[in-house]
From Swiss-Prot:
Region of interest: Disordered: 119-148
Protein name: SsrA-binding protein
Chief location: cytoplasm
Disulfide linkage: none
Superkingdom classification of source: Bacteria
One of the GO BP terms on file: trans-translation
Length: 148
């Protein structure tokens, strides 16, 4: 079950590979995510020293959050990945010109996980072509529906 999707990632990138990663979250963040108060639209993932971090993900604190904790809505959040996955991602991003984007946030056995994608950027004409294909697909469905 998806909590939040990053539709902009599918519009701006060709997704080559998908990997599920854990997140290091604080208690108030988990409560806010369960209440679907999260936005992935402008977020991205980068490598720093020894781990990957999610930046730009906006998690809005609930009004009932603790008074002694000052919630930071856009703080960098560490991703939890296996060493083999880390090596694969580093190799692809450094050599082949790929980037890593968050695709969605979902529950897996009660834990909050993030699906990240190894992606290559789309050019403007690729975006136009994707939009034409989506429009044609919608039009086909409309025609099929009306001919029945």
């Amino acid at each position: 079950m998806a909590i939040a999707n990053n539709k902009k990632a599918f519009h701006d990138f060709f997704i080559e590979d998908r990997i599920e990663a854990g997140l290091v979250l604080e208690g108030w963040e988990v409560k806010a995510i369960r209440a679907a108060r999260v936005q992935l639209k402008e977020s991205y993932i980068y490598w720093k020293k020894d781990a990957f971090y999610l930046v730009g993900c906006h998690i809005t604190a609930l009004p009932t959050a603790s008074t002694h904790i000052k919630p930071d809505a856009v703080r960098p959040r560490k991703l939890l990945l296996n060493q083999s996955e880390i090596n694969k991602l580093i190799g692809k991003t450094e050599r082949a010109g790929y980037t890593i984007v968050p695709l969605d946030l979902h529950f897996s056995r009660g834990k909050i996980k993030m699906e990240i994608g190894l992606a290559k950027g789309k050019k403007q004409h690729d975006k136009r072509q994707s939009m034409k294909e989506a429009d044609w697909k919608r039009e086909k469905q409309r025609l099929i529906k009306h001919t029945r």
